[in-house]
Amino acid sequence: MSTLHKVKAYFGMAPMDDYDDEYYDDVDAPAPRRAPVEDRRYPRRGERFADDAEYGYDEPGYRAGGPAGYADEDRFVSRHAPSREFDRPAPRLGSLRGSAPTRGALAMDPRRAAIFDEGSPLSKITTLRPKDYSEARTIGERFRDGTPVIMDLVSMDNADAKRVVDFAAGLAFALRGSFDKVATKVFLLSPADIDVSAEERRRIAESGFYSYQ
């Protein structure tokens, strides 16, 4: 087509059918179809499993038709299975030491047991509970023999209790002993050769030792 004919066709002076410019030759040609995104990303089912037959399952111990799957299941036991050794309870310390439980009155009051330790000045202590002033003589005899004496005057009336206290105080002074108050209406007479500390007197009062005698 000549240039003049192209100009005429452009301005409508010539029929468009005669205009066969190369730019319009492929207008009616169908565009190539692009494959969907899914088709490009994921292969077809047939293509994906086409070569599955090439991979066999001839591993030793595999049983294709059996219900259990593997014949030698013992080979696959976990190495980290819990051990039965940890289920056993730890032995009690008391059974290892082999010590028998303490029985008797000492087991009921440990503070009293400390007073009775061998070598303690209170190991031979005695407790007297006079009912009236006439029993003061027994207190004097025990104290004179070198025995520490606890006087429990709780059951006495105040008048007789005061007389016994005066007697015991004079006795302790005469024999160079000591006379101490342990609790209300409870007193301790100690010979000269026995020194009872304030801590020991406190322990006697706290433990109620005199009430066990």
From Swiss-Prot:
One of its GO terms (biological process) is FtsZ-dependent cytokinesis. It is found in: Cytoplasm. Residues 27-103 are annotated as: Disordered. Residues 35-51, 72-90 have a biased composition (Basic and acidic residues). Keywords: Cell cycle, Cell division, Cytoplasm, Septation. Its main location: cytoplasm. The keyword Magnesium does not apply. It comes from the Bacteria. One of its GO terms (cellular component) is cytoplasm. It holds the Pfam family SepF. Belongs to the SepF family. Cell division protein that is part of the divisome complex and is recruited early to the Z-ring. Probably stimulates Z-ring formation, perhaps through the cross-linking of FtsZ protofilaments. Its function overlaps with FtsA. Homodimer. Interacts with FtsZ. This is Cell division protein SepF. The gene is sepF.
